[in-house]
Amino acid sequence: MREILHVQAGQCGNQIGGKFWEVVSDEHGIDPKGNYVGTSRVQLERVNVYYNEASGGRYVPRAVLMDLEPGTMDSLRTGPHGQLFRPDNFIFGQNGAGNNWAKGHYTEGAELIDSVLDVVRKEAENCACLQGFQICHSLGGGTGSGMGTLLISKIKEEYPDRMMLTFSVFPSPKVSDTVVEPYNATLSVHQLVENGDECMVLDNEALYDICFRTLKLTNPSFGDLNRLISTTMSGATCCLRFPGQLNSDLRKLAVNLIPFPRLHFFMVGFAPLTSSSSQQYRALTIPELTQQMWDARNMMCAADPRHGRYLTASAMFRGKMSTKEVDEQMINVQNKNSSYFVEWIPNNVKSSVCDIPPTGLTMSSTFMGNSTSIQEMFRRVSEQFTVMFRRKAFLHWYTGEGMDEMEFTEAESNMNDLVSEYQQYQDAVADDNDEDYEDEAMEN
């Protein structure tokens, strides 16, 4: 029941996805060959959220892996967890998308998309009650952004009532991979606004900062960053997979976090994050988790929540703890920082508690916030987009694949609309609406 189908697209998506399956397999006591080696009955109780039980008692991830070039997938397949996945679920092209959104969305990706959809259908038919899809991809490249958004829109067409959750890695302000990132990201956001239900915004720079500052890693690798992301991903769905006192699922999350359908871009955070050297000196308490979880330096995207206001937020705690104390801490945060929450949505922080902590910790918490300050990310990408688009720089790569300049203009204005919507709700005050109603009543 309540299965989630996982899709990973492009190099970034596949690398995050690979780590994610390591984390989840570890939690459920499943070894790299797919056999159960755990110790607790709880691990198997709802293992079918992410795994399908195959013949011989093997557990196979409900995962679809796609890319437009074979490289990343080959390294996944030959890696330690390569034999976990179903071989038919690896779908790849040969040419690559060359960091070109148009290739991923219209030409190369469009040729491959039908075979991806076949596998998605096959996996969806294996589910008793599919809850939704989770998609890992980056927005700066070609495959994850172009083909990833193409897949999202196709899945939305076929399964309009299932939740669509994305973990999207945005281009970072300082760490740039390719020059056309702003184009790819803007075109992708244009799609995500329309077709995504919940979008977790991540970016490499913020993750690097967490690794340097908090985890005290001198030379963090992508593996370290991906482990951070995957712990957060597993925290987002722990309530579906383990028993808890206050449960939450993808739909409850959406209902509680999204006040207006277009504003579904969330900041995520995770606590506790401690450097390995100071781990042994630290006792975990709920107040400490709460404090770190709401800390601006703990957010996994380069936007500062202190520059905006929270429309809504959700905290998912894991471990043995009292729900009363959790609620007290949440109320405490809201009372102390009331100026950072919009006052026209009362009780806008949802908390849930799951009894089983992640491997190696006694308790942890995952944070998701719908903050208006996320507009900083979009604003930054939009400025870079405009600088290039004004000069029509590199446009021929996209028009050569059959795209129209009009699409760029549309995507740009959609993103700017999104920024101004966030700004509008940041500035809104509670009593505005009453006056409007009175004016209307008088006119009538």
UniProtKB/Swiss-Prot annotation:
GO terms for biological process: cell growth; microtubule cytoskeleton organization; mitotic cell cycle; seed trichome elongation. Mg(2+) binds at E69. The keyword Metal-binding applies. Its cofactor is Mg(2+). GTP binds at Q11, E69, S138, G142, T143, G144, N204, N226. One of its GO terms (cellular component) is cytoplasm. InterPro entries: Beta-tubulin_BS (IPR013838), Beta_tubulin (IPR002453), Tub_FtsZ_C (IPR008280), Tubulin (IPR000217), Tubulin/FtsZ-like_C (IPR037103), Tubulin/FtsZ_2-layer-sand-dom (IPR018316), Tubulin/FtsZ_GTPase_sf (IPR036525), Tubulin_C (IPR023123). Keywords: Cytoplasm, Cytoskeleton, GTP-binding, Magnesium, Metal-binding, Microtubule, Nucleotide-binding. It comes from the Eukaryota. One of its GO terms (molecular function) is structural constituent of cytoskeleton. It is found in: Cytoplasm, Cytoskeleton. Tubulin is the major constituent of microtubules, a cylinder consisting of laterally associated linear protofilaments composed of alpha- and beta-tubulin heterodimers. Microtubules grow by the addition of GTP-tubulin dimers to the microtubule end, where a stabilizing cap forms. Below the cap, tubulin dimers are in GDP-bound state, owing to GTPase activity of alpha-tubulin. Dimer of alpha and beta chains. A typical microtubule is a hollow water-filled tube with an outer diameter of 25 nm and an inner diameter of 15 nM. Alpha-beta heterodimers associate head-to-tail to form protofilaments running lengthwise along the microtubule wall with the beta-tubulin subunit facing the microtubule plus end conferring a structural polarity. Microtubules usually have 13 protofilaments but different protofilament numbers can be found in some organisms and specialized cells. Belongs to the tubulin family. This is Tubulin beta-7 chain. It comes from Gossypium hirsutum (Upland cotton).
